[in-house]
Amino acid sequence: MANPFFQFKQFTVWHDKCAMKVGTDGVLLGAWASVQGAHRILDIGTGTGLVALMLAQRSLPDANIVALEIDEAAAGQAKENVARSPWKDRIEVVKQDFLFYQSPDKFDVIVSNPPYFVDSLSCPDQQRSMARHNDSLTYEKLLKGVADLLKKEGTFTIVIPTDVADRVKTAASEYHLYATRQLNVITKPGGTPKRMLITFTFNNEGCIKEELLTEVARHQYSEEYKELTREYYLHLK
């Protein structure tokens, strides 16, 4: 039986009620997205609350985080995870569809680990299907909403499959959002990137591209991945 929770250095994420469990994509997003100087942060599709909790750990002490989640069970578990954390007063979990979310104040930082496998076959489990597929929240709709909610000097960071990168960049440019940082994620030596993290801003000043190898052998993290996640993973000193 899979462990119902994942223990990090400063917080614990229970994921037994969530369709999508704690995984590398979320950890990468939470560790890599810049939160420098941010006072207002939005996490779209928070799931267990993992990314929101990771960002709370390394953001300013007065930074406030809104964690949006459409699925009722996941939102409930995210609220429980936040309530057990040191940052329960700074993270607000909101059960709502992002397509209908409105905020009177814009955000310095927006992040999202959105549904994926856009064109794959439907999953038999409805909850897992909602978490994995973006039939209702397309990349285009996501980016339009982000553009409306992001401050002029703000950043939006997303983790996506590499095969949709061109589509996402094209959609982003329609709303004057441009890639400024890009991390190609390789899971094994000699492999090709299957995941990509991209930071978008309203400034079209070129993009810094980097690569990250996560494992040098099966269940053996690379030094660069260890360095990125050292403040989170319990077993990394």
Swiss-Prot record:
Main location per the UniProt record: cytoplasm
Enzyme class: transferase
One of the protein's GO biological processes: methylation
Protein name: tRNA1(Val) (adenine(37)-N6)-methyltransferase
Key word Cell division present: no
Protein's job: Specifically methylates the adenine in position 37 of tRNA(1)(Val) (anticodon cmo5UAC).
UniProt-listed CDD domains: AdoMet_MTases (cd02440)
Family to which this protein belongs: Belongs to the methyltransferase superfamily. tRNA (adenine-N(6)-)-methyltransferase family.
